[in-house]
Amino acid sequence: MRTKINALLAILLIFVTTVSCDNYLDLRPQDGIVREEFWKTKEDIQAAVIGMYSSLLKSPPGVTVPTGGTDYTMPEYLFMFGEIRGDMVSPGTYVTTDQRDITTSNILSSNDITSWHVFYRVINYCNTIIDLAPAVIDKDPTLTQKQLNNYLSEALAVRAYLYFTLARTFKDVPLKLTATLSDKDNFQLPTSTQSDVLAQVAKDLALAEGYAVTSYGNTASDKGRITVYTINTMQTDVYLWMEKYPEALAAATKVTESGKFSLIQASSNWFTRVFAQGNSSEGIFELQYTTANLNPFYDMLFQRPEFTAAPNVFEGVFGIDYVNSANQDIRSDRCSLVAGTNEIYKFTGLNTDERKALSECDTHWFVYRYSDVLLLKAEALAELGRGAEAVPIIEEIRAKRNAINATSQSVDPANKAQVIDYILAERAREFAFEGKRWFDVLRNAKRNNYERLDILLNMAVTNAPADQQQSILAKLRDPNSHYLPINVYDLYTNKALVQNPFYK
């Protein structure tokens, strides 16, 4: 027990010393006592990996963003990056000016939301594990190569996911693959192209796949830590962005044929099982909040709401059965949102009647669920001209969710655009407010040299103020505007960076 406590204290010390530097990547060298006393046993590696996951939930004590702005948690950034430029959220009573500006595509490089420091902070934790853990095998005879590889797979996959998110959000970003271990490290790193970043992500995931476990022996770890199925799901997502459809289909099939996951039939306790409790048979990778470490959304979405569901979501996305009001999509009222108030309910609800108390708001952040890989698989099939195989996947999910007839679409399986539009509509229902909407539409809009720019433009003006719609459309016709600018602080502290041309 003393060894474990010492290891956990050591990793907390690493957190404090690693993130207090002023350079643009928010990294600090591992010189001195921390590095000398750590990285000696497999327990040290385990503590570092636990710390890596903990940093995905919230920042270590005493750590702030160097820009002086709001120190959002990773899930808050993931929510904002994936939702507030889309068509399913609206500004709430307590929305900030910076948040509102992003919803209307009025984005400046000084915008608080464009900070990437929390991402690079965790990336450095991953890099530190990847660089320093291998040497422990020569110091601890109880550490096996298989155990080491398992830990490395987790760090590689988390790093890959973070870079994947950055590439989808900012397009071209600095690609740092080694830990910051010395003051002599070069902090003036230029950006790498989006294609190069995605290629590195795919490379990391391929390596991680060979190292990963299929199970840790308990449900919480299987859902809260990286497994081979998490990696396969990430690969599916990444390959779709890279327009490598056979590879995406192959990765998705590894998950769907594993027998490890299943959809749960709609019932009175479906919401509680899947979301309020989490770690259900539908979960693939969930960030594990607990009552001792609450999620940030009780304040952000309920007590002082910065965002609400857009007015069109309840009827326009989920539909209403005007003949039988009891006939309702299980994902609709008192799951994704509260009808009438448009409160976003998914991360604060206990069941379909009762909201969690603040002290109980431990709903997870859902990085990937089984329905995600199913619909990504359907997307790959559609792009491969196999729409007849894609449509039944959509219908299977709709049946499990009790989707109503009003949202059903009659599509020609041979018409790729129709099938893709049906998939996007179903993804909107299935992943409402889970940080996916903007990325889903952008991924499909940009294919074949923006052949489907129309779906992005239509989405962008759905809830836009009438007097701003033409301005928004004019901006979004430039593909560079689909990505956020590099924050002005980072441009000032790293002269090697070059701003996105749209924001110059």
Feature locations, PLM:
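Extended ligand-binding clefts on enzyme/binding-domain cores
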Residues: 58-60, 257-346, 419, 431
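Conserved, well-structured interaction surfaces
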Residues: 46, 54-60, 89-170, 195-196, ...
